[in-house]
């Protein structure tokens, strides 16, 4: 025993040493309990609905549109009544930019503050907001508020009275919507010719153009494993179903909303989200007022919000090796280096999650990510250092390159003009780095690359300091613009990239009535020709937290950059002359539309969801309304997918790069329609295909991408229009790239109707219903076939009768020897008696003789 105890002492000492050196190991034990308000992740159900309403095209011939919102009080007992409403205004799908004056009647049971947010509504157009007494309207855009007026009115409260009041005042009403007070109301302005001529209020008014958003908290369970906030946090969110319908196959977006738990101080995090759902969903990540790095891991598709909804530098990683249980998922996170796990949340039903982050007080102020000094050139003149050397010709004071650079030739300028005005609304691009090759899943926070941008009315030139580029470990990397063919040139000190204003992937938007902001990006990637991804791990890609492009940016648009680091830059110019050689993306004077029809007559489009069965024809008509007669369009791609997101491609391709891929595709000729408006015309393209049910789901989506082209001569902005036959043989990569810059995607839902087997579902056809028999039972036989069958049956019957008579006549002698009748019955047929008598003459004489 003494020996045993003597050897046990070192064992205990060794165990104690191991525990002491290991430190506090992150716990993977999670005791699930219902979450409270203090839990960092909250589950919610977002719904969109209205009480009643209507829409019409009655204001088409009038000088203004009229939209009415009649708000009702919410249920009492839910706390303080709501005092603020955000009104989101966008054009309808068939209108790219809305230019018509509008009157909004905003009636509410209590005074409200209306926050108006607009997208693609032209500036300088008069708009009138009539509000209830005590309500005010606030505008987020300064240009929009210059021509917007607000007046207080006393409105009738009942729907019909309010509608009649507006019709009497303005002649007609474009839309009327009754809804409960909500935080967010979404109204799409514009007039569609498919609307009825008058507005008749209905209870079951459902339209994607007029909706209110409601958020309802949902029950969830979870645990918090780290009580104190850290610089790095890992949150695991598991969702059972995005809706309460267990049979729904519609892929929905699950929104993760990330914000600080308190307004200040500023929150800086290295955040990891591990997302899991048993059904196929699309995770949409939105971050507000949180700086740092965000990594999202999920087995499904991952998207991100608009540029204004991306405050963090984000990385996404698709992993399909998730374990099934909660304990194993926690262990999986630790085994893959995602530790310590901060929280775990599981929700039975939800379509939105709010993640609220606490500030890490231990982080020092100098660790807050700021814009590098080299990029202050993009902030504006107040942030720029003074140059030691005088500016060269045409250069902005304090805004030129930090190295000698030859003058850029400029055409169309007069001597002494202000050649490059300062941008009125400078935009700060967010900068990203390539991941470290040793740790490809990490994204670095700051960047020290000297970047200078210069532009004139012909081109943009961006220069990257070679020393700062190589100092940060990017030696041997390749620099291009968004168009990979636009590569950097080198001089002694800098990489120089040059782009015309209408090429190399450059986009633009109007920042003021006389200003244009041009955007492009520097793509940093390995020049290896054998590996198209450039990543050690092919699934991970990097997206800019704010790419500077207007509108939504989806996965399809960022896919070409998913393998590279991206540095976004921009330049603002005053539009001295009408730009030649380019037009707004999907020209503002061109409006696209797509409709589905049941027949090849293309008379009445199918409203709502289009019903289709196996082997049935689907007739598609796409059109463009335009003013330029030389402007044409093409159907670039059409495919059917079980997903509503057009960026998720499928194998069921109908048309690809204008060339038909489905053998059943048939094109139809159509005439060009001229409008009474001067120089306005409508071009149409029609085609059909035979639907094949290749997906095991009842709801599918037809996605078609349309692109502009030039009828006469192709340019760098627009390719020359080609026929489908030519596209199948002569389309090259340059034309495809140009088409992608001017595409517009339309989506139409398809309801798959299954063919019913009558024998299985209707066992007794006569008793259950008078439905006629299934069509395969002689339903399609013509008259000649039926007569042939009847004649054949008659011949067969005659032959059978003759055969029976032959058998009977040859067996009659034996039967009569057994029994000879003395006289025929009186009831026998005379012909039968005559026949029998004639056959018995000889036997009778023989019998009498015997």
UniProtKB/Swiss-Prot annotation:
Changing residue 533 to A: Loss of glycosaminoglycan chains. The keyword Phosphoprotein applies. SMART domains: ZP. Residues 735-749 are annotated as: Interaction with TGF-beta ligand. GO terms for biological process: apoptotic process involved in morphogenesis; blastocyst development; blood vessel development; blood vessel diameter maintenance; blood vessel remodeling; BMP signaling pathway; cardiac muscle cell proliferation; cell population proliferation. Keywords: Cell membrane, Disulfide bond, Extracellular matrix, Glycoprotein, Membrane, Phosphoprotein, Proteoglycan, Receptor, Secreted, Signal, Transmembrane, Transmembrane helix. Residues 817-833 have a biased composition (Polar residues). Pfam families: Zona_pellucida, ZP-N. It is found in: Cell membrane; Secreted; Secreted, Extracellular space, Extracellular matrix. Residues 528-557, 817-850 are annotated as: Disordered. It is a single-pass type I membrane protein. Residues 809-850 are cytoplasmic. The chain crosses the membrane at residues 786-808. Residues 835-850 have a biased composition (Low complexity). Disruption phenotype: Tgfbr3 deletion in mice is embryonic lethal at E14.5 due to failed coronary vessel formation associated with decreased epicardial cell invasion. Gonadotrope-specific knockout females are supra-fertile with enhanced folliculogenesis, numbers of ovulated eggs per cycle and litter sizes relative to control mice. Double knockout females for TGFBR3L and gonadotrope-specific TGFBR3 are infertile. They have increased serum follicle-stimulating hormone (FSH), pituitary protein content relative to controls. They have larger ovaries with increased numbers of antral follicles and corpora lutea. Extensively modified by glycosaminoglycan groups (GAG). InterPro entries: ZP-C, ZP-C_dom, ZP-N, ZP_chr, ZP_dom, ZP_dom_CS. GO terms for molecular function: glycosaminoglycan binding; PDZ domain binding; SMAD binding; transforming growth factor beta binding; transforming growth factor beta receptor activity. Its main location: membrane. Residues 454-728 form the ZP domain. Glycans are attached at residues 143, 491, 533, 544, 570, 589, 696. Forms homodimers and homooligomers. Interacts with DYNLT4. Interacts with integrin ITGA5:ITGB1; this interaction promotes the internalization and trafficking of ITGA5:ITGB1 into endocytic vesicles. Interacts with TGFB1, BMP2, BMP5, BMP7 or GDF5 and inhibin A via the ligand binding domains. Interacts with ALK3/BMPR1A; this interaction results in the cell surface retention of BMPR1A. Interacts with ALK6/BMPR1B; this interaction enhances BMPR1B-mediated stimulation of the BMP signaling pathway. Cell surface receptor that regulates diverse cellular processes including cell proliferation, differentiation, migration, and apoptosis. Initiates BMP, inhibin, and TGF-beta signaling pathways by interacting with different ligands including TGFB1, BMP2, BMP5, BMP7 or GDF5. Alternatively, acts as a cell surface coreceptor for BMP ligands, serving to enhance ligand binding by differentially regulating BMPR1A/ALK3 and BMPR1B/ALK6 receptor trafficking. Promotes epithelial cell adhesion, focal adhesion formation and integrin signaling during epithelial cell spreading on fibronectin. This is Transforming growth factor beta receptor type 3. It comes from Mus musculus.
């Amino acid at each position: 025993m003494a020996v045993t105890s003597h050897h046990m002492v070192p064992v205990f000492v060794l165990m104690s040493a191991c525990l002491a050196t290991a430190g506090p190991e992150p716990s993977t034990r999670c005791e699930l309990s219902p979450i409270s308000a203090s839990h960092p992740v909250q589950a919610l159900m977002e719904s969109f609905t209205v009480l009643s309403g209507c829409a019409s095209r009655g204001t088409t011939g009038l000088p203004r549109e009229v939209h009415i919102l009649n708000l009702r009080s919410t249920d009492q007992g839910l706390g303080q009544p709501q005092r603020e409403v955000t009104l989101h205004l966008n054009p309808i799908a068939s209108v790219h930019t809305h230019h018509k004056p509008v009157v909004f009647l905003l009636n509410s049971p209590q005074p409200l503050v209306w926050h108006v947010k607009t997208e693609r509504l032209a500036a300088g157009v008069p708009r009138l907001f009539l509000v209830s007494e005590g309500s005010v309207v606030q505008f987020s855009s300064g240009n929009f508020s210059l021509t917007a007026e607000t007046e207080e009115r006393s409105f009738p409260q009942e729907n019909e009275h309010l509608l009649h009041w507006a019709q009497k005042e303005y002649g007609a009403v474009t839309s009327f919507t009754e809804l409960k007070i909500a935080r967010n109301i979404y109204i799409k302005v514009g007039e569609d010719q498919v609307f009825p001529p008058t507005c008749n209020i209905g209870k079951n008014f459902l339209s994607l153009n007029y909706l209110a958003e409601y958020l309802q908290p949902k029950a969830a369970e979870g645990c918090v494993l780290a009580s104190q906030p850290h610089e790095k946090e890992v949150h695991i969110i598991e969702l059972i179903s995005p809706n309460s319908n267990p049979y729904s196959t519609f892929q929905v977006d699950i929104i993760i909303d990330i914000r600080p738990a308190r307004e200040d101080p500023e929150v800086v995090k290295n955040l990891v989200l591990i997302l899991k759902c048993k059904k196929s969903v699309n995770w949409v990540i939105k971050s507000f007022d949180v700086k740092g790095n965000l990594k999202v891991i999920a087995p499904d598709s991952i998207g991100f919000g608009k540029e204004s909804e991306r405050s963090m530098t984000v990385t996404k990683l698709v992993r399909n090796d998730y374990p099934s249980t909660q304990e194993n998922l926690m262990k999986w996170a630790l085994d893959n280096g995602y530790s310590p796990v901060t929280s775990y949340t599981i929700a039975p039903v939800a379509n939105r999650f709010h993640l609220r982050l606490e500030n890490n007080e231990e982080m020092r102020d100098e660790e807050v990510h700021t814009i590098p000094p080299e990029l202050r050139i993009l902030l504006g003149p107040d942030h720029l250092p003074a140059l030691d050397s005088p500016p060269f010709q045409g250069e902005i004071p304090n805004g030129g390159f930090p190295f000698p650079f030859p003058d850029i030739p400029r055409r169309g300028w007069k001597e002494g003009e202000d050649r490059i005005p300062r941008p009125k609304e400078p935009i700060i691009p967010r900068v990203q780095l390539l991941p470290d090759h040793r740790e490809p899943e990490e994204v670095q926070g700051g960047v020290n690359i000297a970047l200078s941008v210069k532009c004139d009315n012909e081109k943009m030139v961006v220069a990257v300091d070679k020393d700062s580029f190589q100092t940060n470990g990017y030696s041997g990397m390749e620099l291009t613009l968004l168009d990979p063919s636009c590569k950097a040139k080198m001089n002694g000190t800098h990489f120089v990239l040059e782009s015309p204003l209408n090429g190399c992937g450059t986009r633009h938007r109007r920042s003021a009535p006389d200003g244009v902001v041009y955007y492009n990006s520097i793509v940093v990637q390995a020049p290896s020709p054998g590996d198209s991804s450039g990543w050690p791990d092919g699934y991970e890609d990097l997206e800019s937290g704010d790419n500077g492009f207007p509108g939504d940016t989806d996965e399809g648009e960022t896919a070409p950059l998913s393998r590279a680091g991206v540095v976004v830059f921009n330049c603002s110019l005053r539009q001295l002359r009408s730009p030649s050689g380019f037009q707004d993306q999907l020209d503002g004077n061109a409006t696209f539309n797509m409709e589905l029809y049941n027949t090849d007559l293309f008379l009445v489009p199918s409203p709502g969801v289009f019903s289709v069965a196996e082997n049935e024809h689907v007739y598609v008509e796409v059109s463009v309304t335009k003013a330029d007669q030389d402007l044409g369009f093409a159907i670039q791609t059409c495919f059917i997918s079980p997903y509503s997101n057009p960026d998720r491609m499928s194998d069921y391709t109908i048309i690809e790069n204008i060339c038909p891929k489905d053998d059943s595709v048939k094109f139809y000729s159509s005439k060009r329609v001229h409008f009474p408006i001067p120089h306005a015309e409508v071009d149409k393209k029609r085609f059909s295909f035979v639907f094949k049910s290749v997906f095991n789901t009842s709801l599918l989506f037809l996605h078609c991408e349309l692109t502009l082209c030039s009828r006469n001569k192709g340019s760098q902005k627009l390719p020359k229009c080609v026929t489908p036959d030519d596209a199948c043989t002569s389309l090259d990569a340059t034309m495809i790239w140009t088409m992608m810059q001017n595409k517009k995607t339309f989506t139409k839902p398809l309801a798959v109707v299954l063919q019913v087997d009558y024998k299985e579902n209707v066992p007794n056809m006569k008793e259950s219903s008078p439905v006629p028999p299934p069509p395969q039972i002689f339903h399609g036989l013509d008259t000649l076939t039926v007569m042939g069958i009847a004649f054949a049956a008659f011949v067969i019957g005659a032959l059978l009768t003759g055969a029976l008579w032959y058998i009977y006549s040859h067996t009659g002698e034996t039967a009569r020897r057994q029994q000879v009748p003395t006289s025929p019955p009186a009831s026998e047929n005379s012909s039968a008696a005559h026949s029998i008598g004639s056959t018995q003459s000889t036997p009778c004489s023989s019998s009498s003789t015997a």
